[in-house]
């Protein structure tokens, strides 16, 4: 299912827009969801649970639900995992947000993705990058769950990338913000490494009064750099009010290898 033009909803509050496919759900560059009143938005890939069906939002895509909940996932009801659908990017990621915006305006946001199970590398569960924004306000919460796939290496559960030009941000106001990532595996238990639960490079995760939780478990192979949570290049986790911050990392493979750490923070 490919969306190439903006979807506009003008009905009463409380309606639901469901985009459902047995395979992938793809928003081309600049295709948006625009609504006058609160709208529940469900992007449901891999509806037939065949383990093939990713969600990809392109550069400039904006989904603004005006207070409705936003769900990106897979399976029969969309509450399971969207699953990487091929060995080349972005299809190898369960959910890929590249320069896209999700704004629930007080509603809840849930994102669930699992990387491609096959060959290659970088089969991320959830990849949020290139200046993407995931945000809500009021008591709205954000929940992101990612599981890395199978491949040569670098099959990370959740990867967040930002830089000075493209500041990827994930934020709430009073609601909880939870990111949970589980690294995948190398082919045949290979030695590729970099099977991080959460990799967070630059960018910003923040809340005012909501609790922030980052929980990562690395994958298990005989390689190095399998961190539970890896933060670098001025990655920022910030509470500006009363919200607590919890960062928990677990090594899924041999801790005796190089840089297989629960939590790593670099500059």
Residue ranges and their predicted role:
Residues 267:
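Short, flexible, glycine/charge-rich loop motifs used to bind or transfer phosphoryl groups or to couple energy/partner
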Residues 18-20:
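Surface-exposed extracellular loop regions of Gram-negative outer-membrane beta-barrel proteins
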Residues 1-2, 7-10, 23-28, 32-34, ...:
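Extracellular beta-strand scaffolds
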């Amino acid at each position: 299912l490919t969306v190439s033009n903006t979807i506009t909803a003008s009905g009463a509050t409380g309606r639901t827009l469901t985009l459902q496919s047995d395979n992938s759900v793809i928003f081309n560059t600049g295709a948006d969801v625009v609504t006058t009143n609160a709208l529940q938005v469900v992007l449901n890939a891999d509806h037939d649970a065949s383990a093939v069906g990713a969600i990809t939002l392109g550069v400039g895509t904006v989904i603004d639900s005006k207070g409705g909940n936003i769900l990106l996932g897979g399976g029969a009801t969309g509450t399971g995992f969207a699953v990487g659908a091929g060995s080349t990017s972005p299809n190898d990621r369960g959910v890929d947000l590249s320069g896209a915006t999700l704004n629930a305006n007080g509603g809840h946001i849930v994102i669930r993705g699992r990387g491609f199970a096959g060959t290659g590398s970088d089969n991320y569960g959830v990849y949020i990058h290139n200046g993407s924004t995931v945000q809500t306000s009021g008591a709205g919460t954000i929940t992101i769950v990612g599981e890395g796939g199978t491949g040569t290496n670098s099959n990370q559960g959740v990867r967040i990338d930002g830089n000075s030009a493209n500041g990827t941000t994930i934020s709430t106001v009073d609601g909880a913000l939870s990111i949970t990532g589980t690294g995948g595996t190398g082919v045949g238990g290979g030695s590729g490494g970099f099977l991080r639960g959460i990799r967070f490079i630059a960018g910003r995760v923040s809340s005012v009064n909501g609790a922030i939780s980052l929980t990562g478990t690395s994958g298990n192979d005989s390689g190095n750099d399998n961190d539970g949570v890896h933060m670098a290049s001025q990655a920022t986790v910030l509470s500006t009010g009363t919200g607590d911050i919890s960062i928990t990392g677990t090594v899924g493979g041999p801790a005796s290898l190089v840089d297989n750490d629960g939590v790593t923070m670099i500059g």
